[in-house]
Amino acid sequence: MATNRAKSSTKYIFVTGGVASSLGKGLTAASLGQLLSSRGLRVTMQKLDPYLNVDPGTMNPFEHGEVFVTEDGAETDLDLGHYERFLDRNLSAAGNVTTGKVYSNVIAKERRGEFLGKTVQVIPHITDEIKSAVLAMGQPDKNGQAPDVVISEIGGTVGDIESQPFLEAIRQVRHEAGRENIAFIHVSLVPYLAPSGELKTKPTQHSVAELRSIGIVPDAIVLRADREVPQAMKSKIALMCDVDEDGVVSCPDAPSIYDIPKVLHSQHLDNYIIRRLNLPFRDVDWTTWGNLLESVHNPQGEVTIGIVGKYIDLPDAYLSVAEAIRAGGFGANVRANVKWVASDECETEKGAAEALKDVDGVVIPGGFGNRGIEGKIGAITYARKNKLPLLGICLGLQCIVIEAARTAGLTDASSTEFDANASTPVISTMEEQKAAVSGEADLGGTMRLGAYPARLAEGSLVAEMYGATDVSERHRHRYEVNNAYREQITEGSGLQFSGTSPDGTLVEFVEYPKDVHPYFVATQAHPEYKSRPTRSHPLFQGLVDAALKHQAGRS
């Protein structure tokens, strides 16, 4: 069907949350974005985070989850990973705005005298900075194309002190961009009380009342519950919250996060928003997403991939890695299950054998610090000796190099990250990172971040996986392979340095040849950031394919 595209300004959709955190605002926003994209609209997304950190780059993974890195090198909230995966498009640093970043910019302007001696206040200066960040998302890209829709998610919960400047700012955006160009969606919890056997609407009513008290009237309410919310209850919420009945949608827990677009579409949320904003549209094209759901719900087999890490008590610390593994499964039309393995369990040969006995492949993900390192190395040794498919990421590559060096006779091989005075530092601090590591410069935002090119060796396994010898991946690291040991490691262990930076100075990929090990690959980069559920990353696809062969060989 031809797209009914008329000239119109960019529309802005703001997604807020009420009653409780962790309701799935990000997934709701991403799912709506996916639906609008599937209708032929150009959609971009943004996360407004009310914490005072400038970015999540220095935050504890146990507290915040993973740090998602964009192509342009921004360390951002993990929700940007959901946005990129659901929209299948790259976002930029502008997609994540924090209170810390806003205040830093405003204070810098004050120091430069840009406010001409005026008293700097939350209103208008902080709110103006937030508005500028939001409205900038509607500007044309380098190809001259402005987005049709900008979806901005406001972190936290309505009523939080930290969120107040952001809520005031988006209220003002409605005034400046025009009411016809703005839609507010409120995601709220409808709890089920088991003793009475009832869903309760009162928390949602109070949450919307709080939102209305600061001048924001939601156009739509997404009701989160562990079961379907009946129509009578939706009608009651529409009446009490002064929202159109068509704008109150039920979003019960779904079997998979990839089902959420279908759930919202079945409730006509995308239809309602299109009518509300007078957007050009076409019917939803379910071809790509439908094929994904077929793989999700009707797999032709399954494999188990172990993630050997030290932050496994909070799986969100490895969210993109887990999603990339699952996407590799979708690409092979199998279910890829993730087994969380504490690296400490693999420090001994017996411990590694026990922890990894029922997995078909292993991922050694990134991380920082020396805790759990010997366990990661133990898992690597087990995978190497038992021909278990393995993919190493960032720190995972460094651990593989250390393990190979020890195999080659460099028994004291280590990294300067773990031992500043290591006698055999096969992994060393990057020259430009030494000031940050020594404490002479800031830690935040100073790593080697973002997309960098790499050149792969002709005939290597990684070149076969990518189908190319020139590739680009996103990075987040301070340490690198010490080139002084490369030749000795290869001669003593057989490990091949199969990809480097274009000038050959920085190791980007290592592997064992296929005649030595069926799939033993590592990269200094973070390939998980570029994986999509509808388009798996070559390295993760290779891991799952190798895991299937390993599984078949065992049975």
Swiss-Prot record:
Q: Catalytic activity annotated for this protein?
A: UTP + L-glutamine + ATP + H2O = CTP + L-glutamate + ADP + phosphate + 2 H(+); L-glutamine + H2O = L-glutamate + NH4(+); UTP + NH4(+) + ATP = CTP + ADP + phosphate + 2 H(+)
> Where, in this chain's numbering, is L-glutamine bound?
367, 395-398, 417, 478
Q: Where is the Glutamine amidotransferase type-1 domain?
A: 304-553
Q: Which UniProt keywords apply?
A: ATP-binding, Glutamine amidotransferase, Ligase, Magnesium, Metal-binding, Nucleotide-binding, Pyrimidine biosynthesis
One annotated Gene Ontology cellular component of this protein = cytosol
Function as written in the Swiss-Prot or TrEMBL entry: Catalyzes the ATP-dependent amination of UTP to CTP with either L-glutamine or ammonia as the source of nitrogen. Regulates intracellular CTP levels through interactions with the four ribonucleotide triphosphates.
Q: So what family is this one in?
A: Belongs to the CTP synthase family.
This one is known as CTP synthase
Lineage at the top is: Bacteria, Bacillati, Actinomycetota, Actinomycetes, Mycobacteriales
